[in-house]
């Protein structure tokens, strides 16, 4: 596997140079935990019904997601019922739910039939004291009792110290080791960047420190407040974290969560890390979540946008016209079919040239225009109308102008 895979991707050869990759410490297998049904739904205005959650869980499983965080059963009776039904489906994915550091929450989770729990306790001094009015001793007591009880119930346990990214490293490691020393148990710890405050370098540092000081597998839960959730998650994985938390389309509070689609495609194409996700399922999954969340996908959104493959400007359209039968990857970093996208669409508008006319005519079944003067006349009309309406033209608008010349 390298920077160029026939029919799949063609990225920079620099991405795979030994001097670039020499310090990578990716795990042997990267796990993807999707939290669309919990953290994604926390975006104001997004409400998933039981039917929505079950349908999305099925699509996540079909896409190969390894773990599904199906929600928080204490939120409502419907959420608990949705989690129970998802657990009854026999999906390949492991099903987790989100709980507080309260013993009764573990009983509710167990009754839902989940494989594991994600137990939240504040992980920074400011959140403990300012948000909970707790001291370190109380936090350790609550977390150790909750994690121990969850383990005794046969549940896998991910400890989720919120706001960990803004914690002092000594404070965080004291909390985590204190939980273990007090008899608590967790199978992994999430490095939680609740407010999207990590740089990639900061995340990598804290992953390494957690592995060194606590010795438990690390998961990466990052947000998009500075637009860096994907590179920061990759930095955490490169530093030894084994699991990435994501949402479909990046939905979530404030600027959202780490989006599934560009993360897994970047890992595959730019870093040679196959997560096992079925990339050709990404577009359908994205559309399903967009429809059920009521939040449309921007047309230029990475990987799943509707206008990623195609051109209006004349120069790249000309390049495509000449190269499409040689190798489509000359004009794109990964093949459109890899993610379930349709073939490139040629638009026509203010910035278009003769190649656009030729390819749009071909697509619409219109006769080629051999007379160059007629092509120029048609383009003049196209540009005038495009400027007037401030967009590229519809097929109907173009056909009308075509027949005029």
Task: For the regions a language model picked out, list residue spans one by one.
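Active-site beta-loop-alpha junctions enriched in small/polar residues
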Residues: 38, 73-75, 98-102, 122-124, ...
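Conserved active-site and cofactor/substrate-binding residues in soluble primary-metabolism enzymes
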Residues: 48-51, 55, 77-81, 104, ...
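N-terminal capping/small domains of soluble enzymes
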Residues: 1-103, 345-348, 352, 358, ...
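A mid-to-C-terminal "edge-of-domain" accessory segment
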Residues: 2-36, 272-405
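Catalytic alpha/beta core domains of metabolic enzymes, predominantly
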Residues: 195-325
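Short hydrophobic alpha-helical runs that function as membrane-insertion/retention elements
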Residues: 94, 118, 243-246
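Hydrophobic alpha-helical scaffolding
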Residues: 46, 72-73, 95, 99, ...
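Alpha/beta enzyme core
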Residues: 3-6, 43-67, 85-89, 103-216, ...
């Amino acid at each position: 596997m390298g920077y160029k895979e026939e029919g799949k991707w063609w990225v920079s050869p620099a991405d795979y140079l030994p001097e670039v990759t020499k310090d990578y410490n990716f795990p042997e297998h990267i796990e993807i935990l999707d939290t669309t049904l919990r953290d994604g739904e926390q975006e104001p205005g997004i409400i998933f019904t039981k039917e929505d959650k079950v349908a999305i869980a099925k699509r996540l499983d079909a896409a190969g997601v390894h773990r599904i965080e199906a929600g928080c059963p204490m939120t409502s009776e419907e959420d608990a019922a949705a989690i129970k039904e998802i657990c009854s489906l026999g999906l390949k994915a492991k099903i987790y739910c989100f709980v507080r550091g309260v013993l009764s929450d573990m009983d509710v989770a167990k009754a839902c039939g989940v494989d594991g729990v994600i137990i939240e306790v504040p992980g920074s001094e400011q959140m403990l004291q300012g948000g909970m009015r707790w001291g370190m001793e109380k936090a350790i007591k609550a977390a150790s009792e909750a994690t121990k009880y969850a383990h005794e119930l046969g549940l896998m346990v991910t400890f989720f110290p919120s706001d960990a990214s803004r914690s002092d490293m000594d404070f965080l490691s004291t909390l985590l080791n204190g939980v273990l020393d007090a008899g608590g148990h967790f199978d992994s710890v999430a490095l939680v960047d609740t407010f999207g405050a990590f740089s990639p370098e900061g995340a990598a540092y804290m992953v390494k420190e957690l592995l060194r000081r606590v010795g438990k597998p690390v998961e990466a839960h990052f947000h998009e407040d500075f637009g860096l959730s994907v590179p920061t998650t990759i930095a955490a994985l490169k530093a030894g974290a084994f699991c990435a938390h994501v949402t479909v389309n990046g939905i979530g509070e404030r600027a959202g969560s780490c989006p599934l689609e560009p993360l897994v495609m970047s890992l595959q194409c730019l870093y040679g890390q196959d997560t096992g996700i079925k990339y050709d399922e990404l577009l359908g999954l994205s559309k399903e979540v967009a429809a059920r969340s009521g939040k449309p996908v921007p047309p230029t959104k990475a990987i799943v946008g509707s206008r990623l493959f195609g051109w209006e400007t004349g120069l790249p359209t000309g390049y495509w016209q000449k190269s499409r039968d040689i190798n489509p990857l000359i004009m794109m970093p990964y093949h459109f079919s890899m993610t379930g996208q349709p073939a490139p669409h040629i638009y026509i508008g203010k910035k278009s040239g003769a190649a656009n006319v030729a390819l749009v005519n071909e697509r619409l079944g219109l006769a080629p225009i051999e007379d160059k003067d007629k092509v120029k006349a048609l383009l003049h009309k196209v540009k005038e109308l495009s400027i007037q309406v401030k967009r590229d033209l519809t097929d109907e608008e173009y056909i009308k102008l075509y027949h005029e010349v």
